[in-house]
UniProtKB/Swiss-Prot annotation:
<dbReference type="InterPro" id="IPR023031">
    <property type="entry name" value="OPRT"/>
</dbReference>
<comment type="pathway">
    <text>Pyrimidine metabolism; UMP biosynthesis via de novo pathway; UMP from orotate: step 1/2.</text>
</comment>
<dbReference type="InterPro" id="IPR000836">
    <property type="entry name" value="PRibTrfase_dom"/>
</dbReference>
<protein>
    <recommendedName>
        <fullName>Orotate phosphoribosyltransferase</fullName>
        <ecNumber>2.4.2.10</ecNumber>
    </recommendedName>
</protein>
<comment type="function">
    <text>Catalyzes the transfer of a ribosyl phosphate group from 5-phosphoribose 1-diphosphate to orotate, leading to the formation of orotidine monophosphate (OMP).</text>
</comment>
<dbReference type="GO" id="GO:0004588">
    <property type="term" value="F:orotate phosphoribosyltransferase activity"/>
</dbReference>
<comment type="subunit">
    <text>Homodimer.</text>
</comment>
<feature type="binding site" description="in other chain">
    <location>
        <begin position="113"/>
        <end position="121"/>
    </location>
    <ligand>
        <name>5-phospho-alpha-D-ribose 1-diphosphate</name>
    </ligand>
</feature>
<keyword id="KW-0808">Transferase</keyword>
<dbReference type="GO" id="GO:0044205">
    <property type="term" value="P:'de novo' UMP biosynthetic process"/>
</dbReference>
<keyword id="KW-0460">Magnesium</keyword>
<comment type="similarity">
    <text>Belongs to the purine/pyrimidine phosphoribosyltransferase family. PyrE subfamily.</text>
</comment>
<dbReference type="Pfam" id="PF00156">
    <property type="entry name" value="Pribosyltran"/>
</dbReference>
<keyword id="KW-0328">Glycosyltransferase</keyword>
<feature type="binding site">
    <location>
        <position position="145"/>
    </location>
    <ligand>
        <name>orotate</name>
    </ligand>
</feature>
<feature type="binding site">
    <location>
        <position position="117"/>
    </location>
    <ligand>
        <name>orotate</name>
    </ligand>
</feature>
<dbReference type="InterPro" id="IPR029057">
    <property type="entry name" value="PRTase-like"/>
</dbReference>
Length: 202
């Protein structure tokens, strides 16, 4: 499966000057919503991700995603795994569980995103689940931007990764783009202004 080509074919591999949800800047942005708007393609991708997770024989009861970006990927992965699905959402800058969703003590969760950059939002969701008595056993995403180590791809973890080292991350592929702090962003230095297509604060 050529994940990069799928994103390009769907107009989801964008070039410009972007402010990522992590606060970093990048010349490239992956707009997974353009991929996941096709139900058949979403099902195909998440069926493949479910097979990868199943091959590691990890036991879990539910999948949880951070809103908004992770919801479609998480729901489709839950369907493919025949598991329950819930999502966390940001209220007053705090990741919370609402809408009557419950976490029973000792139940095991995989946290699913569409794209993992440093893993900040996924980690916030994991901490929310754990604060309510759940146990997070792993993370999953359609793609990793090259910072967090990926179990099934055997890709190494970089220093700015926020996901815990002791839990696996499963993805369909890696996209390795340069990202920059605002203070040393070459696009900013050329006078360009970053736009924010992502999830936080929108």
């Amino acid at each position: 499966m050529n994940l990069e080509q799928i994103y390009k074919d769907r107009g989801a591999y964008l070039e410009g000057h972007f402010l990522l949800s992590s606060g970093k800047h990048s010349q490239f942005y992956l707009q997974s919503a353009k991929v996941l708007e096709d139900p058949k393609l979403a099902a195909k991708l998440c069926d493949e991700l479910a097979k990868i997770i199943a091959s590691y024989k990890i036991e879990f009861d539910s999948i949880c995603s951070p809103a908004l970006g992770g919801i479609l990927a998480g729901y489709e992965l839950a369907r493919a795994c025949n598991k329950r699905f819930i999502f966390t959402e940001r209220v007053n800058k705090e990741m919370t569980l609402r809408r009557g969703f419950e976490v029973k003590k000792g139940k095991k969760f995989i946290i699913c995103e569409d794209i993992i950059t440093t893993g900040g939002s996924a980690l916030e969701s994991a901490k929310t689940i754990e604060s309510l008595g759940g146990i997070v056993v792993g993370f999953a995403a359609l793609a990793n931007r090259g910072f967090c180590g990926v179990e099934n791809l055997k890709s190494p973890r970089k220093d700015n990764a926020k996901l815990p080292e002791n839990l696996p991350l499963f993805t369909l592929g890696n996209f390795e783009f340069e990202i920059y702090d605002e203070t040393n962003c070459p696009l900013c230095k050329k006078g360009s202004k970053a736009i924010k297509p992502g999830s936080r604060g929108n």
